[in-house]
From Swiss-Prot:
Protein origin, superkingdom: Eukaryota
InterPro entries: ZGRF1-like_N
Protein known as: Uncharacterized protein YGR042W
MF term (GO), any: enzyme activator activity
One cellular component (GO) term of this entry: chromosome, telomeric region
GO process terms (BP): negative regulation of telomere maintenance
Length: 271
């Protein structure tokens, strides 16, 4: 398509945020067909940046000749531009390609990407023939490899599909004596609770027995004290003549009296 192109003499810089900037000479091209700006270096004619401007207000401000050599325009994201004057204007044919249209591959490239299928292979419609073909194919291993596997793995022919964690079956060990404490045969939580409850019951039973025995012993002591009191009262009632006779008998026999020893007889009370 034919487009009108205008070339401008300009100065550009990439120091966007500095107060004292260094400016370089360049050329700016403007395409009226698609409102495109292109920035080139003056010496080497190297393309530095290109940008499309859609906003009409921005276009008028950039192309206004009153702002030449005065205003700084940020046409590109990385450069500031000051337009000086117009160099030349001309028309040229330009191939405009839409950016949103994707170039799809041709049929030849699609055919190359597809896998090559042999004529002898069965199709999907003939399922029975496909099964027959796959059933005829067998995977065989050499005899040397089988013997090595049997020797290394304890006589068990383990295929590649089995997991490495799996091992041959081993019988459980038998416990010979019941008295041997084995950590693997520890009681469960329920049996532990029962064992904890039984000693508590035993303690409560023994405490009740001790309390009843103490009460019985106190009753017996009270009875004994009552009998002793009655006997001592009877002894006090004795006459002085009996005591004198006892003393005389002891002096004749030559025995020395150590103390008054009395025999206390406990008799049951009729309660």
């Amino acid at each position: 398509m034919l487009s009108h192109i205008v070339e401008y003499e300009c100065q550009y810089t990439d120091q966007l945020y500095k107060k004292r900037k260094i400016w370089h000479d360049g050329r700016l091209k403007y395409f009226q067909l698609n409102n495109r700006f292109m920035l080139y270096t003056e010496k080497d004619n190297v393309l530095l940046a290109s940008e499309f401007k859609i906003n009409s207000k921005e276009l008028k401000a950039i192309l206004n000749p009153e702002g030449f050599d005065i205003e700084e325009h940020r046409i590109f994201s990385q450069f500031l531009v000051i337009i000086s004057n117009i160099i030349e204007e001309y028309d040229r044919d330009i191939q405009v390609a839409a950016t949103h249209v994707r170039a799809y591959p041709s049929n030849l490239s699609v055919q190359k990407q597809r896998p090559l299928i042999s004529d002898n292979a069965p199709s999907l419609n003939h399922i029975s023939t496909a099964r027959e073909v796959h059933s005829n194919i067998k995977v065989t291993t050499p005899n040397r490899k089988q013997t090595e596997d049997n020797a290394t793995k304890g006589g068990f022919n383990i295929s590649k599909l089995t997991l490495k964690v799996n091992k041959p079956f081993k019988k459980p060990k038998r416990i010979l004596s019941t008295n041997v404490v084995n950590e693997s045969n520890r009681p469960s939580i329920r049996s532990q609770k029962i064992q904890e409850v039984t000693p508590q019951l035993h303690e409560t039973n023994t405490s009740t027995k001790v309390q009843t025995a103490g009460k019985v012993a106190l009753n017996n002591d009270n009875i004994a004290q009552g009998n002793y009191a009655t006997i001592t009262e009877e002894a006090k009632v004795r006459d002085g003549s009996d005591r004198k006779k006892d003393m005389a008998n002891l002096s004749k026999s030559g025995k020395r009296r150590v103390g008054g020893i009395r025999r206390i007889v406990h008799e049951p009370l009729g309660i």
